Amino acid sequence: MIKKLSLYTFALLGTLVLFNSCKKEYESVETLDTRSIKEYLAKNNIPENMDPSGFYYQIINPGTGAAVANTDSVYYTYDFKHADGTSITKNGDYTIPGTFLGYTDRFSFLTIPAVRITLGKLKKGGAARVILPSRMAFGKNGLTALGVESNEIIVIDLTLPLFNNQVEVDNFLINKFITANSLQVTTDPTRVRYIISAEGTGKTDLKETSKVNVKYTGRFLNGTTFDSSTDGVTFTLNELIPGWYKVMPGKIGTGGKIRLIIPSDLGYGQSSQTDGMGTVTIPGNSCLDFDIEIVSITN
């Protein structure tokens, strides 16, 4: 009986030791997070505002537009950073995501409620910063692919721009692109911007229903090429995206060269384009930049 009791006692003590060690490990991570965050706040003169869920935040600009709820469609920007300010990942320079506020916490690598909660504290036009404890971010494993270390706190800069629809977003991004690249463009009534470098011959021959042989390069606004043909390929013009067939007729002829900067609704719209393997080649709501040369026209 004594032997059995001793074995039981030792087993119980072992369980308690294991439980306490786990508890201490958790508490040590929490303590480490708190110390790292307080050091960051002090260094950057940021007040200690802690959300009840455990993350810290700073309202940089509360915004002057409408308040937002989880069921509202919003446009937002994000920049995940190390505590030293180095960017980890962010929305692209020429990408502004839009979705329901309730879905803004969903990223390909993690779901982060702190993003949704903090955006919900803003009005449109606002900006905020989230200081995320490691246990609410990438934890003790970190994320090697993004260069995040074990138990590293993460800073997330957020904005809630004053855009009401995709047309406003596209106009903003295209104007930003034009300014950044010092382009001299003409704006078509369709909102497509264009630059004609060579008119070619017989520009009145080019109609929406024409068969055209073209050489072209298609890029995103960040300069990445998504499609091209240097040998020439034949299409019926009105079977292509509206940004081509609504703009090109009457502007260039055979041998003509034009650059088109196309809003997303005159490109592929909200739908992502995929290749034969299902890989996204053109994300939805992408503005596009084309260089086009007309090799021949057939009516």
Question: Could you describe each region identified by the protein language model?
Answer:
Residues 2, 6, 22-299:
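Cross-family detector of peptidyl-prolyl cis-trans isomerase
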Residues 5-16:
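Sec-dependent N-terminal signal peptides
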Residues 17-21:
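C-terminal motif of bacterial Sec signal peptides marking the signal peptidase cleavage site
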